[in-house]
Amino acid sequence: MKEIKTLEEYNALGKEPSIIEFGTPDTCIPCKYTKENLEKFEQNKKFNLTFYQCSDINIITSLEYSSVPVVVLVTPNTKVELTDSSISMDEEELSNWIEQNIGD
C-alpha cells in the first residue's frame, strides 16, 4: 500500500478508483482482519483499485474522522466509508461492498 503523507495527496485521489485505509490499529482484531483482506485483494489484484494507507493523525483529524479505523472507497463519482461497527467484514462481505460501490 502506498502511504498518503499530505492532505493534498488525499484530495488528489478519485480520478482512479482507490481504497484508503486510515489508522488501522493492530490491537483491533476486526480491523486487523479487514486490513488483511484489503492486503489480499491488493496482492491478488482482485479489483482495479489503487490501495493507500494513512496513519498521519493530522490528516485524519482534518478530515473530521473522530475515531479510527476508517476505510474509504473513492471513485470519480462517489466516496463511501466504512467506520466503527461496519469496519468488521469478512472477505466476501468486503468484496461485495467494493463491487457494489466501485461502479457508481
Where are these regions (language model features)?
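Structural microenvironment flanking redox-active thiols in thiol-disulfide oxidoreductases
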Residues: 24-26, 54-61
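Short gly/ser/thr-rich secondary-structure transition/capping motifs
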Residues: 1-5, 51-55
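Structural micro-motif
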Residues: 63-74
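Acidic phosphotransfer microenvironment of two-component signaling modules
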Residues: 8, 57-58, 92
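Acidic, low-complexity, intrinsically disordered interaction modules
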Residues: 46-51, 64
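Non-catalytic, surface beta->alpha helical segment in thiol-disulfide oxidoreductase systems
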Residues: 73-104
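Short amphipathic alpha-helix with an adjacent loop that forms part of the alpha/beta core around
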Residues: 10-12, 61-64
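Local sequence-structure signature of Cys/Sec-based thiol-disulfide redox active-site neighborhoods
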Residues: 2-41
